[in-house]
């Protein structure tokens, strides 16, 4: 799991093995805005781990679809497509697919695979930070 607090820049990188006893490593109170891209995945993770759901969720996928609904999107409406649409840097599709396949394969993961997956997650988090001003007035 990788989380960045937007205003301080503080970064939290932690490996969560999926045990229900793992406490949620981030605050989720009413004063917190939880930003994700296609937030359903993150929210399902919270439920699977027995964590509370965040009170305030901003899904940049929804915001991107609101801005682009009805437009031709040659790179799609996923995170990579949104980054490309706004001219932002994005990892290669093949690299993203390789990491997704590794995550879907499931564990056990080697130490190297854990680092690769955490780096991949951080890349998505960093991309959200770059994308946020294009989709909101925050």
Language model regions located:
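Short beta-strand scaffold segments in enzyme catalytic cores
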Residues: 1-5
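Active-site-proximal helix-loop-helix substrate-binding element of RNase H-like nuclease domains
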Residues: 7-23, 31-136
């Amino acid at each position: 799991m990788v989380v960045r607090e937007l205003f301080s820049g503080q970064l939290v990188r932690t490996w969560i093995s999926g045990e229900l006893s793992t406490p949620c490593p981030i605050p989720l109170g009413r004063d917190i805005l939880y930003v994700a891209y296609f937030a359903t995945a993150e929210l399902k993770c919270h439920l699977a781990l027995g964590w509370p759901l965040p009170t305030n969720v901003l899904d940049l996928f929804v915001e991107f679809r609101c801005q682009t609904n009805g437009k031709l999107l040659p790179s799609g409406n996923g995170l990579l497509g949104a980054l490309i649409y706004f001219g932002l840097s994005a990892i290669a599709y093949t690299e993203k697919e390789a990491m997704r396949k590794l995550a879907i394969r499931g564990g056990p993961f080697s130490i190297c695979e854990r680092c690769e997956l955490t780096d991949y997650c951080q890349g998505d988090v960093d991309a959200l930070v770059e994308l946020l001003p294009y989709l909101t007035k925050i």
